Amino acid sequence: MKSNKRNNLHLGDVAKMGRAPAFGTMVKPIGSACNLDCHYCYYRDKSEIYGNTMPRMSEELLETYIRQYIQGASQQTISFCWHGGEPLMAGLPFFRKAMELQRKYAGDKVIENTLQTNGILVNEEWCSFFKDNGFLVGLSLDGPEDIHDAFRHDCGGAPTFARVMKALELMNRTGVDFNILSTVNARSEGRGAEVYKFLRSLNRYMQFLPVVEYVRQRPGKRPLIVSPDEEDAVEAPWSVSAKGYGQFMCDVFDEWVKYDVGNWFVQLFDVTLANWCGVQPPLCAFGEICGDGMVVEHNGDVYSCDHFVYPEYRLGNIMQGELADMYRSDEQQSFGRDKRDALPLECKRCNYYFLCHGECPKHRFGYAKNGEPYMNVLCEGYKMFFRHTDPYMRYMKTLIEKGEPASGVMDMKK
């Protein structure tokens, strides 16, 4: 979950949104440590970078991070995004100390906190903490039980759906502000409407993240998620196809645009409308350039992006340098510009380029028709979605420009 307050662009506010923050961070207080062993987790093997030790951010490092981030970022609102692994494994005392340090260094700035969790450790005490400190919590839930439990197991191989639903019900009952993050994978292909209806009954805010990964088989061990360029890399069996992802999102959209515009919020629809309206979207993957969201690991190492935690993308360490300087570094600025500059010509000439800007570099391991590299492997699916939603997005843009609610688009389906 990225570090904007609601992680969605509200349709009523789309015309009023300003520029994205100067820079943001995602912090990993326990690194990749987790109490689950989800098949598709792109972060679970990052522990190998740090010698497979049990990581935990020290209090000294926590204070350094909070001070540097608040004092180094130019925006008035500072959004802390706590991530993992499973960040709740850091414990409540750690997070209470973090809140104390935020108050110490806040000055006249506004502090926001978001946190992504699998829900397993959520209890009454955690809910009270979230509620008292105004956290926005992202809960990982892939859909109905058979979809969720296909790839989201605990470390003993047991399913997790019932425990996640218990956490969801507890957060609802205690008034915790949360949204739902769902992956779109091989098990959920063809079931977009079903998944949306299920999630719609649970929460008004949802995100759908496509899973496309490559693995290398290891004798006697689970497959290792690797770059598709690595020798012996094969597509992971849980990956969604481009067409499957596109159809999934079209099916979700058809349900949403008939009944739910303005009352239920789907991140992809919000960022698509933002680009239609010429407003910078709040999601880096759909902007022209990226690089505004660095990652701070448990030991203070800083990387260009959550999806690029590899030695070649390490920018430094906050115990030896300043976050703001790492953001302004040639390496990070070049990383952000490459999102735009490295795209193949076919991409830049596409009628839908202004809507996706090539999407996230993590998915750019395909080839254009002329053989140019860096093509997004989900391109076909995104084109399907953009074609399908085109008339509705145009109409919502017109409504917003006239000062009318975007929900008027639902009349098109009646």
Stretches with model-predicted labels:
Residues 34, 38-41, 284, 290, ...:
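Short cysteine clusters
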Residues 19-60:
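Canonical Radical SAM [4Fe-4S] cluster-binding loop centered on the CxxxCxxC motif
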Residues 66-81, 90-226:
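Radical SAM/AdoMet-radical enzyme domain recognition
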Residues 309-414:
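Flexible mid-to-C-terminal extensions adjoining Fe-S/redox cofactors in radical SAM and related proteins
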Residues 1-27, 45, 75:
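N-terminal [4Fe-4S]-dependent radical SAM core
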Residues 154-162, 169, 173-285, 289, ...:
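Radical SAM enzyme [4Fe-4S]-AdoMet core and its adjacent flexible, acidic
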Residues 297:
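Short, acidic, Ser/Thr-enriched surface-loop or helix-capping motifs
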